[in-house]
């Protein structure tokens, strides 16, 4: 994942961000691209290799993703939302102090704003990600937020993008895909 707002690039003059004492950074793009070209050439007669990444975009990081997209000849980009307001879902920081209604509303609004303003992607990834980190049982996020989810999907479809059906809900023992 590339997660601007949370992580910095390997060559960022400010250095890495630390989480629990461990440095975390985005992909080392020059090294990744060099390795991609090497493997693509080495196995050219056996496999077609495409260049891609998953962009964990937030509205305020769109310009950074635009620059990254222009810097490399990507074939495939998954657009995802992994944080809102630079707060991680998986740590619970984003949900802290908010009701389910509040954090789902803000999550879907961020997703809507991103798909409305960022177009350099191939597929919208796991738009149900919040369910994985929602420790409250029984909240019907789909029906409670159906209008904005519909608006998001209309934009994605109008733009000719794909929509990922992420089946990790089975692994995480969630009730449904949405």
Predicted regions and their residues:
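Domain-core and long-helix interface of multi-subunit machines
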Residues: 71-74, 78-178
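A metal-dependent hydrolase metal-coordination microenvironment
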Residues: 1-105
């Amino acid at each position: 994942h590339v997660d601007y707002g949370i992580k910095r690039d390997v060559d960022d003059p400010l250095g890495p961000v630390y989480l629990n004492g461990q440095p975390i950074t985005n992909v080392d793009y020059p090294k990744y691209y060099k390795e991609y070209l090497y493997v693509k050439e080495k196995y050219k007669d056996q496999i077609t290799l495409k260049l891609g990444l998953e962009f964990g975009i937030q509205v305020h990081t769109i310009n950074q993703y635009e620059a990254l997209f222009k810097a490399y000849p990507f074939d495939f980009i998954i657009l995802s939302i992994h944080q809102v307001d630079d707060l991680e879902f998986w740590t619970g920081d984003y949900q802290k102090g908010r009701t389910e209604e509040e954090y789902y509303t803000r999550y879907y609004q961020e997703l809507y704003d991103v798909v409305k303003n960022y177009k350099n992607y191939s597929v919208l990834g796991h738009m149900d990600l919040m369910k994985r980190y929602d420790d409250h049982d029984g909240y019907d996020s789909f029906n409670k937020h159906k209008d904005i989810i519909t608006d998001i999907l209309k934009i994605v479809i109008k733009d000719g993008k794909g929509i990922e059906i992420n089946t990790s809900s089975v692994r995480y023992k969630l009730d449904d895909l949405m």
